[in-house]
Amino acid sequence: AGDDETLLKPVLNSLDNLVSGL
């Protein structure tokens, strides 16, 4: 579970950046 969170963190960050780009 911990590893999944670590992997999802950058993914969510990237999505946040994409949304900000819109």
UniProtKB/Swiss-Prot annotation:
One of its GO terms (cellular component) is extracellular region. Expressed by the skin dorsal glands. This is Rothein 2.2. It is found in: Secreted. The lineage of its organism: Eukaryota, Metazoa, Chordata, Craniata, Vertebrata. The modification Leucine amide is found at L22. One of its GO terms (biological process) is defense response. Belongs to the frog skin active peptide (FSAP) family. Rothein subfamily. Keywords: Amidation, Amphibian defense peptide, Secreted. Lacks antimicrobial activity. Does not inhibit the formation of NO by neuronal nitric oxide. It comes from the Eukaryota.
